[in-house]
């Protein structure tokens, strides 16, 4: 059996053990809530990515770093948005502003919600910052309208399910 730490507790959705680990970390006993996995995710980031609300809330109660970012430039809000977890998104926004989260991420939460087709989150983020929707862009300069266009184009291609003509390598007669 592997080492028990905050990351493994989140991975197993074990809130009871996580609470024990958090208590030990707070008391300075051999545990660190900010340890990272191979992607640079802290336990809080992993909980957000997996949509584990109780784990995330426990970590936040014990002072997990809400400003953490993984190696891909994703923060807690973008990962909770990716998971499509509105309740978790609201919990995070009680502790840090929407604008501040978006300024620290390569892809703003609204763009993530748009790409993942999480309409409830798109509506929620639009309501939070209705004037900023037109200005919201990824670091690549793609706005919400462009992302929606890309999704529609991809959907049309999927419906056609266009196959490329057989080539020498893919020819079944070979």
Curated annotation (Swiss-Prot):
ANK repeats lie at residues 39-68, 72-103. GO terms for cellular component: protein kinase complex; serine/threonine protein kinase complex. InterPro entries: Ankyrin-KH/SAM_domain, Ankyrin_rpt, Ankyrin_rpt-contain_sf. Keywords: ANK repeat, DNA replication, Phosphoprotein, Repeat. The lineage of its organism: Eukaryota, Metazoa, Ecdysozoa, Arthropoda, Hexapoda. Transmembrane segments: none annotated. This is DNA replication inhibitor plutonium. Pfam families: Ank_2. It comes from the Eukaryota. Inhibits DNA replication early in developments. May bind and block the action of a replication or initiation factor. GO terms for biological process: DNA replication; egg activation; negative regulation of DNA replication; regulation of mitotic cell cycle; single fertilization. The modification Phosphothreonine is found at residue 167.
């Amino acid at each position: 059996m592997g080492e028990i730490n905050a990351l493994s507790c989140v991975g197993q959705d074990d809130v009871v053990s996580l609470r024990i680990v958090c208590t030990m970390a707070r008391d300075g006993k051999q545990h660190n809530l900010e340890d990272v996995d191979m992607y640079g995710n802290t336990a809080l980031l992993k909980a957000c990515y997996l949509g584990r609300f109780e784990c995330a809330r426990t970590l936040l109660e014990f002072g997990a770093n809400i400003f953490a970012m993984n190696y891909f430039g994703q923060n807690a809000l973008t990962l909770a948005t990716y998971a499509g977890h509105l309740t978790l998104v609201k919990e995070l926004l009680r502790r840090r502003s929407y604008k501040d989260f978006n300024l620290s991420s390569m892809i703003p939460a609204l763009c993530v919600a748009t790409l993942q087709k999480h309409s409830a989150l798109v509506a929620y983020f639009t309501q939070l910052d209705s004037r900023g929707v037109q200005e919201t862009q990824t670091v690549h300069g793609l706005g919400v309208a462009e992302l929606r266009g890309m999704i529609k184009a991809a959907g049309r291609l999927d419906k056609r399910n266009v196959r490329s003509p057989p080539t020498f390598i893919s020819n079944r007669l070979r």
